Amino acid sequence: MSTPYRDKWTSDCGTVTLYCGDCLEILPTLAPGSVDAVVTDPPYGLGDKWNGGAGGAKSSWRIPASEAKSWDMTTARGVEDLASFGECIVWGGNYYKLPPSRCWLVWDKKQPDNWTTGQCELAWTNLDRPVRAFRMAQCELANEGLKLHPTQKPVALMQWCLKWIESNSILDPYMGSGTTGVACVRLGRRFIGIELEPKYYAIAKRRIQDELNRVKFLEPKQRETQRTLLEVSQ
């Protein structure tokens, strides 16, 4: 029997599972109860400006056409159905026909008024809490290492998103370079990621493997520090 994915990888500790393939084909195959919440940043259709579309900054500013064409597409299919998985955060949710939300998440990029790109990005949620804002300049993404994907979010932003979600098992069906997965590993959450493009799937897999190894290396030192502090307090 054929599988709906090109590749599947599960971490040795069993907390991370990644799929390379179309999320619309893979999602129905996930085991019931395996996903508690969705945190994702799907592609949304600004259009190929170089091809006569109405595209804006994403397809024409700083990003070569050869790179942008792989992700600057029409609105991703299936986003409207993601809320059925429970708690849900969708970046770019203002581009989709989603239900009214009490709690929008705002990424304030701290950009001046004379910049041509947007000063904020919005995430739709189905959370029952007030609007929240995260302030971090987009240029600070460089502090986290190389920019690996055209629409890559800061790990700190995705960790902040997870702060508002109580669920333990997180799904990102539009995984990109794996930033949501890295954030989940850092916070001890389970993660399922799906990415259509093999190039970005490979990048995400490597990043998440590196983060798992980093956390595994730090755990013994953290336990030793906790043990020392406990002994001192006794």
Over which residues does each language-model region extend?
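Conserved glycine-centered beta->alpha loop in an early N-terminal alpha/beta scaffold
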Residues: 174
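Class I S-adenosyl-L-methionine-dependent methyltransferase catalytic core
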Residues: 1-171, 179-234
